[in-house]
């Protein structure tokens, strides 16, 4: 029988990704007794996210320069085929974060504001006992830690370690949509790096990555991120991601002798309409655990941070009101609707567009349609492209085009 020890706190946050790390630091700042745990023993490891963000997010979410890998001011879209289009701005448009540094910084902030951080702890299960949550965590040596808390937050990402997957959808198209990604961190020559610096480059079209896309993002001088991502299509046999990324490297970096510093990857799993329960009693979901990853660009960091900005004040109110006669469910009843409002009305539109675009992108006909859409962007400014890809402002390109884009025509 593994030995067991126990801890008490007001809020236990399971998962030190962008969502959990941000919530823990916000709550600690407000004087809440918070414990942040993660199964990783080192937050530098498994830095699976390519972590591209628009520049405004740095200020909106109060992120420091130390978490930035590089800045970019240009979009470059390669494909379908060999067509290359680029849009440049004189100003920085965004950043590529060092994902490990972001997680470390958040955990460090939580500690500095008086919170507790415990790594190498895997949450196994949780249940409610009266008005407290009891969560069992396993250490690498098999011993157990029992944490009793007023609230437990499942910020374990797409794994949804405590909340579990949403109940089977009434309509099959409302279920979880999955995307799989693989990324290599490459050491390249400075001459090679300079060709890709300052820009986000995406490869689009079925001859690059069927049902998905590839990318090269710059990090600090001499380091690039090379990645592939695609929607999982159970109806189709899909080529292995390892083969696709090797081929991408061969085509984009011809003749370059690069060193692979790290290989990482992961899954993104989200529902399109985000109607799943966000809470079960005193267990609350945050970030990817409640489908805040957007499937159009596999982008979830901003939205994970948004979910914690919404939840933090509501949790504080709920803690302040503890003892009053409101139930846990009532105390956080505004969470899901407020988060839906914060993500905006274009959210599920972008998800449907993602499903249609990526799943359909496996043949020349779809490449032709994509090429037409990209041609329509030729006269845009780089800032307009950011508004489209980060702000999901499809209506700018004509409401008449939307039914076509969404597959209603
Ligand atoms: C290949 C790839 C590329 C991406 N690129 C981008 C990008 O460019 N821009 C962008 O915005 N987003 C990107 N994303 C998505 C983004 O990384 C996620 O949406 C974001 O990290 C979600 O944050 P989170 O905190 O909700 O979950 P996560 O970041 O997944 O964090 C969850 C944490 O919980 C821990 N955990 C899981 N289970 C347990 C358990 N049982 N016990 C304890 N701890 C546990 C994990 O170790 C992890 O640290 C990418 C994703 C992938 C896979």
Where in the sequence are the language-model features?
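FAD/FMN-dependent oxidoreductases across multiple families
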Residues: 234-314, 318-320, 327
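Beta1/beta-strand and adjacent pyrophosphate-binding region of the FAD-binding site
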Residues: 4-17
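Glycine-rich FAD pyrophosphate-binding loop
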Residues: 26-47
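Predominantly flavin-linked oxidoreductase catalytic cores and closely associated redox partners
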Residues: 109-254
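N-terminal Rossmann-fold NAD(P) dinucleotide-binding loop
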Residues: 20-21
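Dinucleotide-binding Rossmann-like beta1-alpha1 core, especially the glycine-rich loop
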Residues: 82-103
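N-terminal FAD cofactor-binding segment of flavoenzymes
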Residues: 40-77
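C-terminal helical "tail/cap" subdomain of flavin- and related membrane-associated enzymes
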Residues: 316-409
